[in-house]
């Protein structure tokens, strides 16, 4: 699938807009046999219109996907870098959170209070490779602009 936000990248991602579309796609994925649905709740440093500290899904969209997944006994995981995206994950029972690197004090408190059922994967492997061995994917200017090395230091 060619995504509009990353025109030079083929992806298996599905794009949705609005709670009803998230519900529909979640049901479709479950009918196709998936066990885990991954949501991309925050942006990322390489997405031009939505940086890592941006929350790109609304609460209603996350709630809609979570409602369907939980009703069918499926799990959710999430790309969640921004503080608000981490909070949305906890509020809606998303058990696996990737990154969480911009979590504020409130988000950290929520993670601590719910640590018995949450799994946080900082996913620093990609960041380390991009920062120091990513010549095939990124220019030095992109590495600096995306803050990969700073991310490893924080």
Segments the model singles out, each with a brief description of its role:
Residues 1-88:
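Histidine/acidic-residue-rich, glycine-tolerant segments that coordinate divalent metal ions
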Residues 38, 96-98, 121:
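Conserved beta-strand positions in the central sheet of alpha/beta enzyme cores
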Residues 87-107:
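Structural recognition of alpha->loop->beta junctions
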Residues 4, 102-154:
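Active-site-adjacent C-terminal substructures of enzyme catalytic domains
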Residues 8-16, 48-59, 94-96, 134-153:
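Glycine-rich tight-turn/loop motif centered on a GG-T
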Residues 72-75, 94, 116-118:
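Short glycine/serine/threonine/alanine-rich loop segments
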């Amino acid at each position: 699938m060619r995504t509009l936000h990353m025109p030079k990248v083929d992806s298996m991602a599905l794009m949705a807009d609005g709670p009803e579309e998230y519900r529909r796609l979640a049901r479709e994925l479950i009918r196709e046999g998936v066990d885990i649905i991954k949501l991309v709740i925050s942006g990322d440093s390489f997405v031009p219109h939505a940086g890592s500290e941006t929350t790109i899904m609304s609460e209603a969209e996350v709630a809609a996907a979570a409602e369907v997944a939980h009703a069918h006994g499926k799990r959710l995981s999430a790309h969640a870098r921004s503080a608000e995206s981490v909070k949305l994950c906890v509020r809606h029972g998303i058990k696996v959170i990737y990154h969480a690197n911009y979590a504020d004090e409130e988000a950290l408190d929520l993670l601590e209070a719910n640590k018995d059922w949450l799994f946080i994967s900082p996913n620093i492997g990609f960041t380390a490779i991009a920062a120091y061995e990513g010549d095939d994917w990124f220019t030095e200017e992109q590495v600096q602009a995306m803050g990969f090395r700073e991310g490893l230091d924080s």
